[in-house]
């Protein structure tokens, strides 16, 4: 089973709270996190792309780095870990992203892939004059499909005359070709998103849910497996969890309660407003799921809270769900969280026994 880290490219990570660790994103912070993840044998790191924050007292995600340039820098200071950058498809032409990816493939020696972000937060794009209108909600995966087709043709042949509804190439050239396969990942939660991932992605990120309910993603995995059965491709689920660990269950739960008590309500209001813009969104879509009231302070992602032994046991249960190829983790405190996980949690995980690397 693969293990990845969802790095904090935006301030305060994934906790919309004034009581959680407060920090700004920097290259040095993310370098430290990714290098330590590599040290502990993590297989991959992913950076999101977010172009407008949620505001509130915590100024949540008002500070964000850019994904490709960050990962290019990290590629130069790592040696084994796979790196995924995110492209917001409304912001960068596919031919440019194909060339950027080829460059980072060269820097990393074949450790680079791309996460396709079709976009659900209208304000991110509207502020730059890039929002094509609300009908985009209905065709964003068709748009993303053509986007990926253009990139893959350029990577495969170095040229494209692609003629689609949204993109038209005219004797478009891109050389050198990438020396290695550039993997594609997606994060489809809706049936349309799952179908896109099953057709074009190598992995699909799946949102786990609940607190200490490690197998709650079983239905989403089943939906992905059904979608993959129709395409005949091998696409596994990378399941997203937040880890809040401490020496005892009680200490970890006390931290989680404190974060909940400090929920930044104003930031949640902004997120809910953005999530409501797509009137046709499926109930399982990302925009709907992250705004469910039960646990919106961390986007309703699956949350594992407990002692090191409890966290290890629950993550092993998560890994056992059919279709799960890996887990992607966030932490309440990334610097301390990576160290605690590497030293105290991972050695207890049976699902990681075959992957453990000796400390350098």
Curated annotation (Swiss-Prot):
Q: What is its EC number?
A: 1.14.99.46
The record, for InterPro entries, names: Luciferase-like_dom, Luciferase-like_sf, Pyrimidine_monooxygenase_RutA, SsuD_RutA_monooxygenase
- Biological process, per Gene Ontology: alkanesulfonate catabolic process; nitrogen utilization; uracil catabolic process
NADP as UniProt keyword? yes
Record keyword Membrane present? no
Instruction: Write down the top EC class of this protein.
Output: oxidoreductase
Tell me the superkingdom of the source.
Answer: Bacteria
GO MF annotation: an example = alkanesulfonate monooxygenase activity
Return any one Pfam family short name: Bac_luciferase
Report residues binding FMN: 49-50, 115, 124, 140-141, 190
Report the Gene3D superfamilies cross-referenced here. Luciferase-like domain (3.20.20.30)
User: Member of which family?
Assistant: Belongs to the NtaA/SnaA/DszA monooxygenase family. RutA subfamily.
Relate the protein's function as given in its record: The FMN-N(5)-oxide reacts spontaneously with NADH to produce FMN. Requires the flavin reductase RutF to regenerate FMN in vivo.
- Name of the protein this chain belongs to: Pyrimidine monooxygenase RutA
């Amino acid at each position: 089973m693969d293990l990845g880290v969802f790095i904090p490219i935006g301030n305060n990570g994934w906790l919309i709270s004034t009581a959680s660790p407060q920090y700004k994103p920097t290259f040095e912070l993310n370098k430290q996190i990714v290098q330590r993840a590599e040290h502990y044998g993590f297989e991959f790191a992913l950076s999101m792309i977010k172009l407008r924050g949620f505001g509130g007292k915590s100024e949540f995600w008002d500070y964000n780095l850019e994904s490709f340039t960050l990962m290019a820098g990290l590629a130069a200071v790592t040696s084994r870990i796979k790196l995924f950058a995110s492209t917001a498809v409304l912001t960068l032409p596919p031919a440019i992203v194909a060339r950027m990816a080829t460059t980072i493939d060269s820097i990393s020696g074949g450790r680079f892939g791309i996460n396709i972000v079709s976009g659900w937060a209208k304000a991110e794009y509207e502020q730059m004059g890039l929002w094509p209108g609300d009908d985009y909600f209905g065709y964003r995966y068709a748009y993303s499909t053509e986007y990926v087709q253009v990139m893959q043709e350029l990577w495969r042949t170095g040229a494209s005359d692609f003629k689609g509804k949204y993109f038209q190439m005219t004797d478009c050239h891109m050389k050198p070709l990438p020396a290695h396969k550039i993997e594609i990942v997606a994060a489809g939660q809706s049936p349309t998103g799952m179908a896109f991932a099953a057709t074009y992605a190598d992995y699909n990120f799946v949102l786990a849910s609940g607190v200490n309910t490690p197998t709650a993603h079983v239905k989403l995995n089943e939906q992905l497996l059904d979608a993959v059965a129709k395409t005949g491709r091998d696409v596994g689920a990378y399941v997203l969890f937040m880890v809040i660990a401490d020496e005892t269950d009680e200490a970890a739960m006390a931290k989680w309660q404190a974060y909940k008590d400090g929920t930044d309500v104003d930031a949640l209001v902004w997120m809910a407003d953005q999530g409501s813009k797509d009137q046709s969104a499926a109930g399982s879509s990302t925009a709907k799921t992250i705004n469910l009231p039960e646990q919106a302070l961390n986007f309703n992602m699956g949350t594992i809270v407990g002692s090191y032994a409890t966290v290890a046991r629950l993550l092993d249960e998560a890994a056992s769900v059919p279709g799960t190829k890996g887990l992607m983790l966030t932490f309440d405190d990334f610097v301390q969280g990576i160290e605690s996980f590497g030293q105290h949690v991972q050695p207890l995980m049976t699902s990681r026994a075959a992957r453990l690397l000796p400390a350098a």
